[in-house]
Amino acid sequence: MTKEKYLADRFLDDTYSEETRRHVSTLTIGRLTSNACFRYAPPFLASISDDFNISLSRLGLALMVTEIAMGISPLLGRFVDRLHRRTAMAGGLLAISGAATIAAASPSVWIFVLGILLIAVAKFIFDIGLASWVNDHVEYEKRGRVIGLTETSWALGLLVGVTAMGLVASATSWRWGYAVGALSVAIMGLVVMTRLDGHDVAGSQRSRDTVKHKMPLNGYWIFGAMFFLMAASQTLFVTFGSWLEDEFGFTEAGISAVVFGLGAFELLASVTSARRTDTWGKERSTIFGAALILPAGLLLTVGHNNQVVGLILLGIYLLGFEFSIVSMLPLSANLIPSSPGRGLGIVLAGGTLGRASMSLIGTAAYDKFGINVPAFIGAICAAGMIGCIVAYGRTTPSNV
């Protein structure tokens, strides 16, 4: 009997379950479309703020409100733990499609912000469902490779998704970019709904019993690390598009080209992390990524006037972020092994707070000083993240 071949077989051998190898590629593509919708706005904030006739810092304040509202993420994690994994993932994707449609059709900035908020909430439900699905099917020691594979969707969402949406925006408007994203993610929601087994792991009695378990105290070091890591990412991601437009005269098409290059950097980091994190160790790999962010941010504070140097440093900065986040996710999902959704939800709440703070601080600092101050703040955040991971390692008996 001929063994069925799957796309993921290039990365996962027979020691991984057939269920994992059969579906991980589909779920990765689904997450690519969700990440494209989620990541689309920041590079084009200048165009969006112009359309609504408001300043960049005011739009940053509006985005901060959406991030603060995402403080409900630990509750969402507990809720998702009770759902069928297929329900959480397919439902999350279809909800993202609806939210992106709201953003595309928004008549005012506050309706736009509502759409962005709903995209974030729905994406969170999908991501928690995916992380829990991986926990259900893959042993912890092998989880880094599978999560690394699914996490390539973060980079590909930028490389393929945001680039395509940006090119549509350059030919029409940013609203049609969202429309394309909404259609793509809806298609993948239907694919996930039809391909995954309906009886796949649900919020069984086991899950309902164990979600009451508390986060271990040392797990809050990972909460802090996620706060600093996401803050470091957000401070540049919400400002680099405006920097390119103001400093070097980039158009939406030019920014899309830069987004493509940054996505390639992130993809390199994702693939490398997927191959190396389980071997190097998750904590060590997370620190390695932050160790790239720190010098890149500091050098960008002085090299931001040179287009080539600035773009290279920006690429290294985001490469370090991607390597760190991929390495930290399996660590986060295992903090409460019997309730991965709740543990990951608490940690991602830290990331939400980090993004919220820098949505306001980063855009306000850019409006007043330019890109150099946000870059410096990002470097300091990377140092804070390294400190949190070191502290976690010292309070954890066994590190994997």
Regions found by a protein language model. Name each.
Residues 42, 221-260:
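Extracytoplasmic gate region of multi-pass secondary transporters
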Residues 64-77, 260-269:
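Central cavity-lining transmembrane alpha-helices of secondary-active solute carriers
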Residues 72-107:
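Conserved MFS/SLC helix-loop-helix module at the cytosolic interface between two early adjacent transmembrane helices
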Residues 73-84, 269-281, 366:
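Helix-to-loop junctions at the C-terminal end of transmembrane segments
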Residues 117-152:
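Cytoplasmic helix-loop-helix junction between adjacent transmembrane helices
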Residues 150-196:
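Helix-loop-helix hairpin linking two adjacent transmembrane segments in secondary transporters
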Residues 283-328:
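C-terminal transmembrane helical hairpin of 12-TM major facilitator-type secondary transporters
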Residues 338-368:
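A late C-terminal transmembrane helix in Major Facilitator Superfamily
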